[in-house]
Amino acid sequence: MSSTRIPVIALLAAAGRGTRLGGPIPKAFVTLRERTLLERSLQAMLTSESVDEIIILVSPDMETYARDLLRKRGLLNDPEGVRIRLVHGGGERADSVWAGLQAILLDDATPDAIVLIHDSARALTPPGMIARVVRKVHEGATAVIPVLPVSDTIKRVSLDAGVVVDTPNRAELRAVQTPQGFLLSELVAANKKFFADPNPGFIPTDDASLMEWYGADVVCVQGDPMAFKVTTPIDMMLAQRITDEAEPTIFEVPGD
């Protein structure tokens, strides 16, 4: 748990259907070596010793399943002094995050609280990376994202004709991961503005893009290849191989 007086609250997104993974259940509840992706993401948050509360965003039809699962694992009894609770997510990611923020606001959280938003499908995220994001917000950043350099050449393509428009300079491009960290007051203000606008002009694919739209500076920290998102069957094969070979070391806390 965080030793600072400023609370750190994590929103763990687990409401997505995960159709690209090809399974019959939401991907957060897909099992990887006897533990669901949700459990693994939750454990990484706990092991990071950086959070005071974790809010799991689930679809209403999965709430009972999720609650029973976490209760069996002893994860609803404030493990390590961290409060864990379930909140209904929405149809889109932005809706789920807004539901989580409203739950935080109902608890009268301090405006300078730190909010982490994390994809449960990034189940092998190292705890040290989580701590790194939190630390950067503590240092004064309003919005923080973990990133990695891209190795592929990226093309911008016209959506209608499928023709290459240009080739961005790869040195300026980064692949963005989660958890992303934010100052609560600024994240709430950005969401209020977005949901009040009948025509915001875009659909945010992550929370940092919403903060960019709002006008906030988004600061980057070093990401980690282990924080990849389990989205497709190939991703799951990779995650299985990694856990088969490196399970005992995945949740060790690096000294960074």
Swiss-Prot record:
Belongs to the IspD/TarI cytidylyltransferase family. IspD subfamily. SUPFAM superfamilies: Nucleotide-diphospho-sugar transferases. One of its GO terms (molecular function) is 2-C-methyl-D-erythritol 4-phosphate cytidylyltransferase activity. Catalyzes the formation of 4-diphosphocytidyl-2-C-methyl-D-erythritol from CTP and 2-C-methyl-D-erythritol 4-phosphate (MEP). It catalyses: 2-C-methyl-D-erythritol 4-phosphate + CTP + H(+) = 4-CDP-2-C-methyl-D-erythritol + diphosphate. Its EC number is 2.7.7.60. PANTHER family: 2-C-METHYL-D-ERYTHRITOL 4-PHOSPHATE CYTIDYLYLTRANSFERASE, CHLOROPLASTIC (PTHR32125:SF4). GO terms for biological process: isopentenyl diphosphate biosynthetic process, methylerythritol 4-phosphate pathway. Signal peptide: none annotated. It holds the Pfam family IspD. This is 2-C-methyl-D-erythritol 4-phosphate cytidylyltransferase. Keywords: Isoprene biosynthesis, Nucleotidyltransferase, Transferase. The lineage of its organism: Bacteria, Bacillati, Actinomycetota, Actinomycetes, Mycobacteriales. InterPro entries: IspD (IPR001228), IspD/TarI (IPR034683), IspD/TarI_cytidylyltransf_bact (IPR050088), ISPD_synthase_CS (IPR018294), Nucleotide-diphossugar_trans (IPR029044). The record marks R20, K27 as: Transition state stabilizer. Pathway: Isoprenoid biosynthesis; isopentenyl diphosphate biosynthesis via DXP pathway; isopentenyl diphosphate from 1-deoxy-D-xylulose 5-phosphate: step 2/6.
